[in-house]
Amino acid sequence: MESADFYEAEPRPPMSSHLQSPPHAPSNAAFGFPRGAGPAPPPAPPAAPEPLGGICEHETSIDISAYIDPAAFNDEFLADLFQHSRQQEKAKAAAGPAGGGGDFDYPGAPAGPGGAVMSAGAHGPPPGYGCAAAGYLDGRLEPLYERVGAPALRPLVIKQEPREEDEAKQLALAGLFPYQPPPPPPPPHPHASPAHLAAPHLQFQIAHCGQTTMHLQPGHPTPPPTPVPSPHPAPAMGAAGLPGPGGSLKGLAGPHPDLRTGGGGGGGAGAGKAKKSVDKNSNEYRVRRERNNIAVRKSRDKAKQRNVETQQKVLELTSDNDRLRKRVEQLSRELDTLRGIFRQLPESSLVKAMGNCA
């Protein structure tokens, strides 16, 4: 981590494997030391750079990132190229100190009294600059290939369109297993023990795991969904302590007692098993039977009365029909008589009768 009391170092003059550090004391600002560490002598003019030695003779560093087309960027080719060049540079850098390379002052060296940089003999060897171009290439090639944020050399990411089979699977699974948000855990009791506090959290995890879906191949059968534990209590038991027949659905419906038979157990074919046994000699059973008999008698009397009333209406309507039929026959006979009378009269009398009417 960088400290707030340090300053950026000035650009380093070119160095070679045969060039020793200048005899003058470096300035504090040039090597990033805090102010006030010692008197800052005026900077001496840098020594004239000597031509590079034989080791670094053919090494150059050219930034070609601006000339590379991102569309034509080949990851494998550049990876092999950079790795091969880096191996060569590291081998040359390792052979550099053996060939007579000296120690150079660097910003990370410890400062002695007066702000001067101490030699490498007292505090271990500094990082070897076997040759300037080798270190420079190592520093340039790493970010050139490894950095991803560079806009010019960003690796190409080929977008793959989703296949129709995957979309069909996802739609089918989404229809079979609709997502349901897990119920929130109930608030813990203020005086509950740790065991009581862990139970709601466990139920919440089970409920959350019950909502997960499985992606299977089309040929495999679809498993049933994981049952989610219900926060409601178990379905009510029958009158005799047995669960009602028909499963949990009938148990949740809640059986209604029959007023006629007086049963209070579950419904269906096994209603008699869940019915409470009643003593036939008790007064309660006798009163219930008497009420049932009275209700049956009333219903039978009402049915008989409705039948009698219906028969009376039928008789009345039949008599009215006969009477109307006789009336129709009488009117038909009178019509025939009047027609015979008009046929017997002459036409002159008919004309006179029509004139008088006019």
Swiss-Prot record:
It is found in: Nucleus. This is CCAAT/enhancer-binding protein alpha. It holds the Pfam family bZIP_2. Residues 317-345 are annotated as: Leucine-zipper. Keywords: Acetylation, Activator, Developmental protein, DNA-binding, Isopeptide bond, Nucleus, Phosphoprotein, Transcription, Transcription regulation, Ubl conjugation. There is a cross-link at K159 (Glycyl lysine isopeptide (Lys-Gly) (interchain with G-Cter in SUMO2)). Changing Y285A: Decreased transcription factor activity. Strongly decreased transcription factor activity. Binds DNA as a homodimer and as a heterodimer. Can form stable heterodimers with CEBPB, CEBPD, CEBPE and CEBPG. Can form stable homodimers (also isoform 2 and isoform 3 dimers) and heterodimers with CEBPB (with isoform 2 and isoform 3) and CEBPG. Interacts with PRDM16. Interacts with UBN1. Interacts with ZNF638; this interaction increases transcriptional activation. Interacts with the complex TFDP2:E2F1; the interaction prevents CEBPA binding to target gene promoters and represses its transcriptional activity. Interacts with RB1. It comes from Rattus norvegicus.
